[in-house]
Regions:
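N-terminal extracellular/periplasmic Venus flytrap/periplasmic-binding protein-like
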Residues: 35-119
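Periplasmic-binding protein-like
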Residues: 52, 120-134, 151-154, 195-200, ...
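Extracellular/periplasmic Venus flytrap/periplasmic-binding protein
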Residues: 166-277
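Beta-alpha junction/loop-to-helix N-cap segments that form part of ligand/metal-binding clefts
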Residues: 31, 36-38, 89-164, 168-171, ...
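Solvent-exposed, acidic/polar segments of extracytosolic/periplasmic ligand-binding ectodomains
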Residues: 41, 406-473
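Bacterial signal peptide processing site
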Residues: 27-29
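C-terminal motif of bacterial Sec signal peptides marking the signal peptidase cleavage site
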Residues: 21-25
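Extracellular/periplasmic periplasmic-binding protein-like sensory domains
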Residues: 274-376, 464-468
Length: 473
C-alpha cells in the first residue's frame, strides 16, 4: 500500500528536527527507485542536486566585523559551484549534470542555520550537502541525522560522525580534544597536578570536547576550572563580554595553563584581558577555524605562543621557509586563480594571505587571497565517489563508494594524504603541533623568504617540527 503524503511529511519533520531520530526511518523515501534500491532524493536521470551551505556575510558586516571586499556570499558559493560547472562542461558525472543549490545562514544568528537543515531535508531536499566551514555543528548533525550525505570542513562531535552520513576532513571534537591534551601533558606543557582552565562554548562540539579533555586532565591529577560561553545565542558582543569575565574566573582559580576550546569570534574579550598572566595556552582544534590560517590571523596578540595539535597544514616549514606545494595543492591553486581572476585586480593568490584580501607585501609585491584548501579537497573526494557509485546512484551506493576510496589527497592538511575506508568518517590520517607566531604588518622578509617564519606579514601558525603523528582514535 502506498505511503500517505501526511505520513511522509511527519517522517521528514521528525528526521530534520530530532537529533536522535533513527536512520532507518530517515533514509526511506517515496523517491526510492534506483536500480539497486536506496534513497535517490535529489537525483533524476539527468541531474544530481548538491546543496552548498555558505554564510550570508551581510550579517557579519552589519554587526561591524571588517571583511575584505572580495569576501562575499557569491564568491564563497562559487568556490564550490565552479567545480560543478567544470564537471558539467566535461559531460557531467555518469551522464548527469550536477546542480548546486546554494543555502545561506546568518553567522551572527547561528540558529538561522536551522533553515539550512530544513531546506536540505524537507523544503528543497538535495542528494548531498557541502559546508566547507563555518556552520554550527548542531545543524550539520541535523542534516546528517536525516540521512543526507554531508561533507564538513570544520570539526563536529562524535555523535554527528556516528550517524554514518557525515564526512569531515578532521576527526571528531572528542578525538581532537583528547589528542591535544594528551600531547600537551606528554610534552610537559601541562604539568601533572597543575591547575588548568578550559575556555569553551556551549555548542555540542564544545561540550563533547570539554568532556574528553577533562578525562585526560583528571587522569593527570589536574584541578580543572571551566568557563563556558553561550555561543548558541549568537550575539558576538555578549559572547565577548562573557569570555572577558573568564579571565577573572581563571585568576581566582590560580590556573597556570588554559585549554582554549572556543573560536576567535567569541573569545576576543578573553584575549583583550589575558595578557600579563604568564598562562600557557593549549588550543584544542574543536570548533570553527580554531587552528586554520584564518583563525590564526584573527586571534589577538596575547594568544601568540599558544600551541595547537591539528590535522590542518601550513604554508611554511619549521625552519622558516615557504613549504613546497604538492601536485594536488598546485592544481587547487591554479583552479582558484582561474576562478578569481577578476576578483583581485589581477593579483595572484599567495600562501598565507587571509581569505578575500588583496595585499601589498613589504617588498612591494601585490598578492591576493590564498587558495581555499577545504573546497578543493572535498569536491575532489565527492567527484571520485560519485563516479565510483555508477549510474544506479543512491545515497547508500554513494556512501559505499566514498568509504571505499582508499587513499585521498588533502590540500594543506594531514601532510597531503588522507584515506577513506569502511567505518572511517573523516579524511585525515595525521596530526602535528603548530605554534601561533607574530608577524605584524610591515614585518620585513627574512633571508629564507618568510616574515618571522610566516608566509606573509600576518600572524600565523608555524609547525614546531617536521614530524606528523598518526591520529589516535
Amino acid at each position: 500500500m502506498a505511503r500517505s503524503r501526511t505520513w511522509t511529511a511527519v517522517i521528514a519533520v521528525v528526521c530534520a528536527f530530532t537529533l536522535t531520530a533513527g536512520l532507518a526511518a530517515c533514509s526511506s523515501s517515496d523517491d526510492d527507485s534506483s536500480g539497486g534500491g536506496g534513497n535517490t532524493t535529489g537525483v533524476t536521470d539527468t541531474s544530481i542536486k548538491i546543496g552548498v551551505a555558505v554564510s550570508d556575510l551581510d550579517g557579519l558586516r552589519a554587526a561591524g566585523m571588517a571583511l575584505a571586499p572580495a569576501l562575499t556570499t557569491q564568491n564563497l558559493s562559487k568556490r564550490l559551484t565552479s567545480y560543478f560547472d567544470e564537471w558539467n562542461a566535461a559531460g557531467g558525472i555518469n551522464g548527469r549534470q550536477v546542480e548546486g543549490v546554494v543555502m545561506t545562514w546568518d553567522p551572527v544568528k547561528p540558529a538561522t542555520a536551522q533553515k539550512v537543515c530544513d531546506d536540505a531535508t524537507i523544503n528543497t531536499p538535495v542528494f548531498a550537502m557541502i559546508n566547507s566551514n563555518g556552520m554550527g555543528a548542531k545543524y550539520i548533525e541535523c542534516i546528517a541525522q536525516a540521512g543526507v550525505p554531508i561533507f564538513f570542513g570544520d570539526v563536529a562531535p562524535q555523535s554527528a560522525h556516528d550517524t554514518g552520513w557525515l564526512t569531515t576532513i578532521s576527526p571528531s571534537a572528542e578525538v581532537n580534544a583528547k589528542s591535544g591534551i594528551d600531547a600537551a601533558i606528554k610534552s610537559g606543557q601541562i604539568p601533572k597536578g597543575a591547575a588548568v582552565g578550559i575556555l569553551s562554548g556551549n555548542g555540542p562540539e564544545h561540550v563533547a570536547a570539554v568532556a574528553a579533555a577533562k578525562t585526560s586532565l583528571e587522569a593527570n591529577g589536574n584541578k580543572i576550572t571551566v568557563a563556558q560561553i553561550n555561543t548558541l545565542q549568537g550575539d558576538p558582543g555578549i559572547q565577548n563580554t562573557e569570555s572577558a569575565a573568564a579571565v577573572n574566573t581563571f585568576k581566582a582559580a590560580n590556573v597556570t595553563n588554559i585549554a582554549i576550546a572556543l573560536q576567535f569570534t567569541a573569545s576576543n574579550g578573553f584575549w583583550d584581558n589575558a595578557g600579563g598572566n604568564n598562562w600557557q595556552f593549549t588550543f584544542l582544534d574543536v570548533a570553527s577555524s580554531m587552528c586554520t590560517p584564518f583563525g590564526g590571523k584573527s586571534l589577538k596578540p596575547s594568544a601568540v605562543g599558544g600551541i595547537c595539535f591539528t590535522v590542518f597544514g601550513d604554508s611554511v616549514t619549521p625552519d622558516g621557509k615557504l613549504k613546497p606545494e604538492s601536485a594536488f595543492e598546485k592544481e587547487c591553486r591554479a583552479k582558484f586563480d582561474a576562478l578569481s581572476v577578476n576578483d583581485f585586480g589581477g593579483a595572484p593568490s599567495y600562501p598565507g594571505v587571509p581569505s578575500g584580501e588583496t595585499r601589498t607585501l613589504p617588498d612591494g609585491t601585490k598578492v591576493s587571497s590564498d587558495a581555499p584548501p577545504n573546497e578543493c579537497t572535498i569536491t575532489n573526494v565527492m567527484k571520485r565517489a560519485l563516479e565510483k557509485a555508477g549510474k544506479n546512484l543512491s545515497r547508500e551506493s554513494f556512501m559505499k563508494a566514498l568509504r571505499g576510496l582508499g587513499e585521498v589527497d588533502i590540500a594543506n592538511g594531514s601532510n597531503g594524504i588522507g584515506s577513506q575506508k569502511e567505518g572511517k568518517t573523516y579524511l585525515a590520517t595525521l596530526t602535528h603541533p603548530v605554534k601561533l607566531t607574530a608577524a605584524p604588518t610591515g614585518t620585513a622578509k627574512n633571508a629564507t623568504g618568510t616574515y618571522n617564519g610566516c608566509p606573509v606579514d600576518v600572524q600565523c601558525w608555524v609547525p614546531t617540527g617536521t614530524t606528523w603523528y598518526d591520529i589516535a582514535s
